[in-house]
């Protein structure tokens, strides 16, 4: 019942730009083809602010992120994360998500066969299964990376913070340094995998017959008068003329940095020939910060929330719903639309799934939410009256409750129309530091309804 009440309140947020959109579905409980009629009402400012706070709370964000203005060319980290988003989103709702990216790096959803509504909203919320469009050819994200998604509920990419090369000793004159800020990671998230990625173009023709060894080190301790102590993390061997992304495993180091952020002194990278001669990383073909934006080095980490964190989130959500229900009982009926506003006794139908589309773009969040532009949340509404037929997905308890309600209508209420199956959505967004975050939010989309 609480979920139904929440969704009915959420009707106010159908059109975040300032309009309410209410749809009545036609069809059975399992019918994904939703046809709608619409009622519009302009939102008051305090309603819009409340909706913004609620959505940010669901996303686990204390405030609206305000990233730096992106450049004209899409950079490597967001492109990589878009590939992961496609993989994760197609797994969550394979018929819902399809992402393409423009040269400016702006993510857009496409939905085949969606006639536009007066405010740009789709009336038809079903797509036949299709392979998601990718941001790169070939994709930046490999099968190995997408496999990490099975154990992760959040992925973050980090940009290199080093703006000027250090002067190292003659022995390490060709070393390059990289630093990443991991302090923005939410509390309770554990690193399941982490990678450092750097792009390799063709190396200098002098080394065309050479095998080049590229090594990545963790900086253990820094000194003012000599080179830092280094710990070897990973090594890759490649031919000078090879082209593509080199991936280094830095999982253990990333976990150490998350637990002990004061020890995050960064990474150093070097390139050597087969006989051990240190060479300039640019001569080896490695692309640094002066290269194209789409080939910039970056770090990516996969996270999974601890069970303690999940329990605390569920407890906080439960308390919040209780407080919301208390406030609703004292609320002016004219302030928020209720089920009775849209479902008169003549219109009331059996329990079924109805349209509810949430648009991030119309909320004005397109500068920090990369994808999706919005999502079809749906909600459940309708009567659970005797007899409960097979199409109502009624539980045995609901059937018994219906019979008892017939005998004692003043003491036992009817069963409630509620979701019987919920799906997750994936959201890709920038944080305040312009790091890109991909996070899975569970129980966000109603797949089917029934009587409970």
Curated annotation (Swiss-Prot):
Q: Which Pfam families match?
A: TGF_beta, TGFb_propeptide
Q: Its GO biological process terms?
A: allantois development; anterior head development; BMP signaling pathway; cardiac muscle tissue development; cardiac septum morphogenesis; cartilage development; chorio-allantoic fusion; ear development
An example of a GO molecular function for this protein is: cytokine activity
* Principal location listed in the UniProt entry: secreted
Q: Which InterPro entries match?
A: Cystine-knot_cytokine, TGF-b_C, TGF-b_propeptide, TGF-beta-rel, TGFb_CS
Q: Note the SMART domains from the entry.
A: TGFB (SM00204)
Q: Which UniProt keywords apply?
A: Chondrogenesis, Cleavage on pair of basic residues, Cytokine, Developmental protein, Differentiation, Disulfide bond, Glycoprotein, Growth factor, Osteogenesis, Secreted, Signal
PROSITE patterns, sorted: TGF_BETA_1, TGF_BETA_2
Residues with an annotated glycan are: 209, 325, 343, 393
Q: What happens when the gene is disrupted?
A: Deletion mutant mice show a number of skeletal defects, including small ears, several reduced vertebral processes, and a reduced number of ribs and sesamoid bones. BMP5/7-deficient mice lack midbrain dopaminergic neurons due to reduced neurogenesis in the midbrain dopaminergic progenitor domain.
Q: Where in the cell is it found?
A: Secreted
- Note whether Cell division occurs among the keywords: no
Gene3D superfamilies tied to this protein? 2.60.120.970, Cystine-knot cytokines
What are the disulphide bonds in this sequence? 351-417, 380-449, 384-451
Signal peptide position in this chain?
1-25
Region named Disordered: 316-345
Propeptide residues per the UniProt entry: 26-314
What the record says about family reads: Belongs to the TGF-beta family.
Indicate what this protein is called per its UniProt record: Bone morphogenetic protein 5
Q: Which organism is it from?
A: Mus musculus (Mouse)
Lineage, please? Eukaryota, Metazoa, Chordata, Craniata, Vertebrata
- Gene responsible for this protein: Bmp5
């Amino acid at each position: 019942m609480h979920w139904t009440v929440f969704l009915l309140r959420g009707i106010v947020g159908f059109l975040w730009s300032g309009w309410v959109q209410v749809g009545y579905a036609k069809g059975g409980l399992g019918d994904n083809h939703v046809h709608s009629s619409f009622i519009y009402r302009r939102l008051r400012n305090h309603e819009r602010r409340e909706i913004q706070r609620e959505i940010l709370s669901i996303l686990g964000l204390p405030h609206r992120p305000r990233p730096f203005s992106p450049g004209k060319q899409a950079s490597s980290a967001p492109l990589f994360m878009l590939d992961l988003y496609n993989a994760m989103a197609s797994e969550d709702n394979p018929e819902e998500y399809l992402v393409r990216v423009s040269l400016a790096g702006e993510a857009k959803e496409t939905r085949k066969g969606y006639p536009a509504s007066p405010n740009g909203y789709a009336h038809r919320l079903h797509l036949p299964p299709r392979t998601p469009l990718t941001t790169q050819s070939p994709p930046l994200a490999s099968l190995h990376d997408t496999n990490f998604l099975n154990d992760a509920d959040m992925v973050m990419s980090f940009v290199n913070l080093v703006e000027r090369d250090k002067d190292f000793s003659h022995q390490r004159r060709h070393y390059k340094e990289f630093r990443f800020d991991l302090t923005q990671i939410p509390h309770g998230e554990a690193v399941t995998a982490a990678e450092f990625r750097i792009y390799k173009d063709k190396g200098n023709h002098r080394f065309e017959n050479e095998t080049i060894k590229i090594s990545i080190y963790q900086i253990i301790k820094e000194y003012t008068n000599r080179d830092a102590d280094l710990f070897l993390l990973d090594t890759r061997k490649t031919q000078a003329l090879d082209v593509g992304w080199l991936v280094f495993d830095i999982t253990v180091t990333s976990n150490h940095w998350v637990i002990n952020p004061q020890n995050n002194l960064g990474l150093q990278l070097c390139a050597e020939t087969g006989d051990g001669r240190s060479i300039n990383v640019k001569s080896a073909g490695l692309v640094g910060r002066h290269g194209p934006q789409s080939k910039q080095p970056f770090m990516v980490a996969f996270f999974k929330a601890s069970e303690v964190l999940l329990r605390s989130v569920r407890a906080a959500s439960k308390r919040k719903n209780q407080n919301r229900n208390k406030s609703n009982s004292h609320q002016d009926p004219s302030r928020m639309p209720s089920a009775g506003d849209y479902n008169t006794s003549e219109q009331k139908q059996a329990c079924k799934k109805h349209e509810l589309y949430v648009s991030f773009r119309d909320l004005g969040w397109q500068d920090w939410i990369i994808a999706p532009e919005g999502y079809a949340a749906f909600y459940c509404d309708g009567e659970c009256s005797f007899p409960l037929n097979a199409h109502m997905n009624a539980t045995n308890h609901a059937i018994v409750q219906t019979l008892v309600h017939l005998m004692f209508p003043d003491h036992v209420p009817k069963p409630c129309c509620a979701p019987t199956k919920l799906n997750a959505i994936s959201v890709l967004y920038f944080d305040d530091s312009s790091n890109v975050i991909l996070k899975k939010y569970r129980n966000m989309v109603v797949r089917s309804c029934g009587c409970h």
